[in-house]
Amino acid sequence: MDFGALPPEINSGRMYCGPGSGPMLAAAAAWDGVAVELGLAATGYASVIAELTGAPWVGAASLSMVAAATPYVAWLSQAAARAEQAGMQAAAAAAAYEAAFVMTVPPPVITANRVLVMTLIATNFFGQNSAAIAVAEAQYAEMWAQDAVAMYGYAAASASASRLIPFAAPPKTTNSAGVVAQVAAVAAMPGLLQRLSSAASVSWSNPNDWWLVRLLGSITPTERTTIVRLLGQSYFATGMAQFFASIAQQLTFGPGGTTAGSGGAWYPTPQFAGLGASRAVSASLARANKIGALSVPPSWVKTTALTESPVAHAVSANPTVGSSHGPHGLLRGLPLGSRITRRSGAFAHRYGFRHSVVARPPSAG
């Protein structure tokens, strides 16, 4: 634009009627804030990547992450530099406006000059105001030139401040093929839902035939893991219980596996029912009985009558069997012959007697 062709009223009016340098200063502050944020983000990304790839995370996944994140970190750093430059340019534009504003003639001064010239011309009846009119016109020409110079300088400075390096687009850190795969998956959903609904509508002959299908379908993966863990714990607990029970049996019952206590058998079975039913064991000193020259326990002859005749103490030819219902001695007493002797009168076994043998007659063949 040719600012020299415009009168000072227009140039000065444009400079004074606008909002001033306030918006440009606000823009400069905003760009500075953006630059700081981008710089912090780039520094944070670089620090985290260096910390992860330093020791804890290595391998193909780490290399893939670094390859995808490094260009983005570089873009953040570049964007921070561009934002800082934009802030500086906005501040430069505000400074150029301030300089042009100072150089521009205020509109009231121009208006006063124009009023003075018109007044001098109106009252110049005899030419007495010609010199004053020339001076006022010269001042107006200076205002014109001053505004033109200010506007030309402001246009050049603002044009230089408005030259910004465009921001580059951020690099792609994702796979564009994923969008195609997602579209294909979404397109396949109606058919999948239709197949699921048709499978759910299948009629079963017996409702109890598909209880397992409903049960498994209602169990979530987390619940399945919990069920498997509980089953494992129950089997483990059962094995441990059997192990400790076998140890307790060996310690309590002995190698045979069964031992009767004071109250009877540990297991209520017929073969152990009589265990522990005898009287408590007792012992005495110098109280043994005599059978001939043999010392025997008192229980051996406890049931033998002491008033029997000497013949009754002989060993009977038909020994009696001790009753199992009698007192529980060690050998259940000795067989007695006195009772048999009483039934047979004075008969008794005689030892050392020589029997007479009758020979077989020849007539017997």
From Swiss-Prot:
Extract the InterPro entries matched here. PPE_C (IPR022171), PPE_dom (IPR000030), PPE_sf (IPR038332)
Q: What happens when the gene is disrupted?
A: Mutants with simultaneous deletion of PPE25/PE18/PPE26/PPE27/PE19 genes have a slight growth defect at 100 mM phosphate in defined media, and at 30 mM phosphate, growth is severely impaired. Knockdown of PE32 or PPE65 in PPE25/PE18/PPE26/PPE27/PE19 deletion mutants result in a severely impaired growth in phosphate-limiting media.
Positions in coiled-coil regions: none
One of the protein's GO biological processes: response to host immune response
Q: Which SUPFAM superfamilies match?
A: PE/PPE dimer-like
Gene3D superfamilies found in the cross-reference section: PPE superfamily
Tell me which PANTHER family the record gives. GLUTAMINE-RICH PROTEIN 2
What the record says about family reads: Belongs to the mycobacterial PPE family.
- Name this protein carries in UniProt: Uncharacterized PPE family protein PPE25
The species this protein belongs to is Mycobacterium tuberculosis (strain ATCC 25618 / H37Rv)
UniProt lineage: Bacteria, Bacillati, Actinomycetota, Actinomycetes, Mycobacteriales
State which gene encodes it: PPE25
